[in-house]
Amino acid sequence: GIDTPEGVAVLETFKHGILQNSFFISLYIPDRSLSFLRDFDAGNQALYPLLDALVAWLVKVHDQGVYHQDLNVGNILYRELPSSGFSFQLIDNNRMKFYSELSLKMRLKNLRRISDNVDLLNYILKRYAELLHLDTNKVQLQGCFYLMAFEAKQYAKRKLKHCLLKPIPQ
C-alpha cells in the first residue's frame, strides 16, 4: 500500500457554490514536506538520492492505480531512514482517486502538477521514464506539454473567476 497519515476529518468551504478551501486533517507525524523542492537547484548533488527514491515511489504509487488530484511536492512528506533510503507519505488524501490501472497519459498528467520548477519536473520525468524503460525525451516532452496546458487552463480559470466576482458598475 501507500503510506498516508491517519485521517481525522475533511473540511471544505464553498462560496457561491465554488470550492474556496479544502483541508484534510490528520494525526501528527514527524515527517517533513518536500515543498523545499520548489526552489530546486539542479547543481545540488545532495538532493539526487532523495529525488531518485521519490521517483521510484511515484512509480509504485501509479502502479497501484493511485491518482492524487493535487500531486505536488507540498503534499508529499518524507523521512530519511536510518538504514539509508527514504520513506514517503501522501497527504491531502481526500483528493485521491483509485483505478485498476493508470495509462501513461494519466501518469504524466498526474506528474505535471508535481512542481512548476521545470528543472525538477524534467529530472523527475527523465528518471520516471528510465524506470519504466520508456523514451526519456518523449516522456519529458509530453510531461512539459501537459504542464503548459495545465498552467494555461489555471490562468484562464483565474481570469474568469476574477471577472465573475468583480462587481458590475451601475
Labelled PLM ranges:
Residues 44, 48-55:
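Conserved short alpha-helix within the protein kinase catalytic core
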Residues 9-10, 73, 83, 141:
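Proline- and acidic/polar-enriched loop/turn elements at helix boundaries
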